[in-house]
Amino acid sequence: MAKVNAHATRELDVPTERVLEFLRDYREARPKILTGNYTAYRVEQGGHGQGTVIGYHFAAGGRERDYRLRAQEQDGVLQERDDLSSFVSTWTVVPAGNGGGSSVTLAASWDGAGGIGGIFEGLFAPLGLRRIYAQILDRLAAALGT
């Protein structure tokens, strides 16, 4: 099994703390930036930052599955680990530019399937997920008024 990785990055004209505060809000803010690939989104525990547990159904590229993620945060990095698989999503927000903006990266990694299916997964899943993540970052920018 090879590790599969996908990511998208966008610079925003918004301070890092404002971006992080938005991303920590799993009840009100986070659902606003999800694409139609995410359904049955719910907060199971907490709702703000560290310790929050969320669930959703994700469908893309002819595949569907359920996720149950636990939020962890350290040094401006918000990580969400799936209880049901090796999937991890990571939001990294760092200062960018001279005007107090931010660079926001949404990344995912997981253990890919073995065999020929794993080869195709490693080639095509990152492309599709990168497109979806770019849309999420566009929605984040719009939600933050940039």
What are these language model-derived features?
Residues 11, 51, 64-66:
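Positively charged, low-complexity intrinsically disordered regions
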